[in-house]
Amino acid sequence: MITTNEIRRSFLEYFEKNGHRIVPSAPLVPQNDPTLMFVNAGMVPFKNTFTGLESRPYKTATSSQKCVRAGGKHNDLDNVGYTARHHTFFEMLGNFSFGDYFKERVIELAWGLITKEWGLDPERLCVTVYHTDEEAFNLWRKIAGLPEDRIIKIATSDNFWSMGDTGPCGPCSEIFYDHGPEIPGGPPGSPDEDGDRFVEIWNLVFMQYEQVNAETRLNLPRPSIDTGMGLERIASVLQGVHDNYDTDTFKALIAASGELTHTATDGQFKASHRVIADHLRAAGFLVADGVLPANEGRGYVLRRIMRRAMRHAHLIGAKEPLMYRLVPALLSEMGMAYPELVRAKALIEETLRLEETRFRQTLANGLKILEDETQHLKSGDTLPGAVAFRLYDTYGFPYDLTADALRARNLTVDQAGFDAAMAEQRKAARAAWKGSGEKASDEIWFDIADQLGGTEFTGYTAEKGSGQIIALIKDGKRVETAKQGDDITIITNQTPFYGESGGQKGDIGVITGNNDLKMTVTDTQKPLGRIHAHIAKIEKGEIKIGDDIQLQVDINHRNRLRANHSATHLLHAALRDQLGQHVSQKGSMVSAERLRFDFSHQKALSDQELAAIEAEVNQQILNNSVVTTRLMTPESAVEAGAMALFGEKYGNEVRVLSMGSCLNDQNEESSWSVELCGGTHVSALGQIGLFHIVSETAVSSGIRRIEAVTGEEARLWLVGRDRLLRETASILKAVPEEVPTRTAAILDERRKSERALADAQKALALANANGGQGGNNAAPEKVGAYQFIGQVIEGLDPKALRGLIDENKKIIESGVIALITVNEGRASVAIGVSDSLKDKISAVDLVRKAVETLGGKGGGGRPDMAQGGGPNGNEAAQALEAVKALLEKA
């Protein structure tokens, strides 16, 4: 059997004899690329060569590059140990041409290596090409003699590679190995392509274009080649196994782990041994390349990798620090190819030993407290359940570990007392939950959390992943199974689906599984803040608790959520920048369609302020700076300048999002926005695309609200407004630029016409009051002891009634004037009383009588002038009669 070391060596030697320079692996920490946490692909060290920023003394190269994918978008950490091909550390074999050979030569070299040098059966190989790349399609037929049905055209981005929004790019061609029909799965491009039967072993990237901008792509004057072959994958193929962890290197590390812990390497401990083997490689190489455990950045990623392995070491029963004792096995397998491992042996061992010792301190603290609590007990005694619960609740010391520790001393734990203490805590928590206004039916989540714990969220760096169903809820009750057509809530042990929290709506997507299972996820909630509940409908198939499933987030929906959520952070920073540091977030809502942001401010924002805020946010988007995430304690985060967001609850560890750039008080570049946030975000601000404010309103006293859209929604919103503007311009028979002035002129003419009409109506009413033609019995008449003018006027602006009352008072020196105008069925009434009579007669009393007749309520004013109205304009004449009747009694 060919070993992994022999495969690596034969790959490099093959390309060396074909004119390539063997280039040693670059360190895992990128030397000239601040956008990357770790080198994660073979081409990374050559990036500046491909872009023309640097030159090399050779035109072709080959390498075996160390890579780590445990942070950023290439995060495989959560799947490691549970799948056949996920790793944190891996080696990428590659050959590169910097303007030398192109498609034909790279296909010749690739086919020659895998079929002639390594002897792979051509009948087990198929390739993919980009759907428009006819050149590559024809070359595969010519060079490899592959039939057309094994040259698969793919139209997705899987077969088109780009370095970013701009820069070198081009189509890809991937080589797949067929493990045979006994392995589930279909060829690439088929519905079941995610199965394990067809495995990609080599990706050939044809860099032939320069992406200038979103609309422009030019041919490169010197096309280049970048290829990548995962060493672990090709080793599994050449060694005749279907699982990378069954290859020689991993088998040796796993065997060492089993030997040191005296445990079986399969069965219940299989995944744990695999995690330890993989993470040992990652930790060893990272320390050798200068990364040390820390609470942020690369050091924090290393610490996560280490502690994940150390947790699994504890699970398999390791009583002492294990990881550092596995370093000799790592050097035995990989030290020859990577002498830096040998040089750093002492540092690697000491770093692992110290970190595991510190990590185990939590357990040690718990055991010490347990010893203090049991020193007075004798053989056969029982530890009170309340003590065991305090160990669990306060110190995180599991009940099972307490029981195991006491068993050796012939002591037991009062489990009933422990359960009672646990139940009492649950009761208190549920009472608090009910007191918060939540539905009583939500108690079901406490049962699930108590029995199964929370859901592990893997979606910060992944949109798809595997999971196991641990609970099902249908019609508010837990069930064991569900079938096609059921509306079901699914809880899994882990998920990439974000559950609604912190103002951000939940993810949607698809869940698939065996036997063509398909479920559509329409929402994801997060009850109790730690369970991810997938709200779904079963489109096809059946499910039961314990089923393994695949979860795929709707990437378009997720990306829109990311853009809107990151935009709220930028908006917050812009508001503080433009309005002052008094601005703080008071609430938010982030959906895929839009965002809403509530903030403290005492007055409405001017158009100029809104424009400045919008411009500042869009400038940060155009700058396209990278968004960075650090995991820190809340105290450290606040000390670092992070703002805590309204309504968020923070645990012992928080995510700190930094985005944008600005100059600080020391004239140094710093992040524009630094906030604590648990939501999902873009990786670079340019992914937001565009930001546009659609409204600014008041929520309550001192609280304002901005609603905005981003990306495609912003574009569509602006397109819609542009269409309305053009339609308005067409109606006005003007060009769009003239709409404001033309509209202002029309409104001015309308105001003039309305004033002229009001003046004419007023003049007519006065003429009637003077006994002119067309009068409506409006001449003064005697009512009781008083002079009275009463008139109903159709269509008069109610605002003109008061002035008309004053004009009529000049006609009668002492008396009462009652005027009613009717507009669209509604009546408005005004009554005036001469100054000489206001002590005897109140205009307010008279108006209220008229308003009552008109079907209204109230009415008010002064004794000499009062107004009111009612909906029954057809009762206007009767209202005047009611006023006269009241006046006769006065």
Swiss-Prot record:
Enzyme Commission number, as recorded: 6.1.1.7
Gene3D superfamilies documented for this protein: 2.40.30.130, 3.10.310.40, 3.30.54.20, 6.10.250.550, Bira Bifunctional Protein, Domain 2, Threonyl-trna Synthetase, Chain A, domain 2
Biological processes, Gene Ontology terms: alanyl-tRNA aminoacylation; negative regulation of DNA-templated transcription
Entry superkingdom: Bacteria
Top-level enzyme category: ligase
Disulfide-bond pairs as recorded: none
Subcellular location field: Cytoplasm
Residues annotated to bind Zn(2+): H565, H569, C677, H681
Signal keyword on record: no
Family annotation (SMART domains): tRNA_SAD (SM00863)
UniProt GO molecular function: alanine-tRNA ligase activity; aminoacyl-tRNA deacylase activity; ATP binding; tRNA binding; zinc ion binding
Swiss-Prot/TrEMBL keywords: Aminoacyl-tRNA synthetase, ATP-binding, Cytoplasm, Ligase, Metal-binding, Nucleotide-binding, Protein biosynthesis, RNA-binding, tRNA-binding, Zinc
SUPFAM superfamilies for this protein: Class II aaRS and biotin synthetases, Putative anticodon-binding domain of alanyl-tRNA synthetase (AlaRS), ThrRS/AlaRS common domain, Translation proteins
Pfam family for this entry, one: tRNA-synt_2c
Chief location bin: cytoplasm
Cofactor detail note: Binds 1 zinc ion per subunit.
Cofactor needs: Zn(2+)
Catalytic activity, as annotated: tRNA(Ala) + L-alanine + ATP = L-alanyl-tRNA(Ala) + AMP + diphosphate
GO cellular component, one term: cytosol
Chain's role: Catalyzes the attachment of alanine to tRNA(Ala) in a two-step reaction: alanine is first activated by ATP to form Ala-AMP and then transferred to the acceptor end of tRNA(Ala). Also edits incorrectly charged Ser-tRNA(Ala) and Gly-tRNA(Ala) via its editing domain.
Family: Belongs to the class-II aminoacyl-tRNA synthetase family.
Domain notes: Consists of three domains; the N-terminal catalytic domain, the editing domain and the C-terminal C-Ala domain. The editing domain removes incorrectly charged amino acids, while the C-Ala domain, along with tRNA(Ala), serves as a bridge to cooperatively bring together the editing and aminoacylation centers thus stimulating deacylation of misacylated tRNAs.
Protein name in the entry: Alanine--tRNA ligase
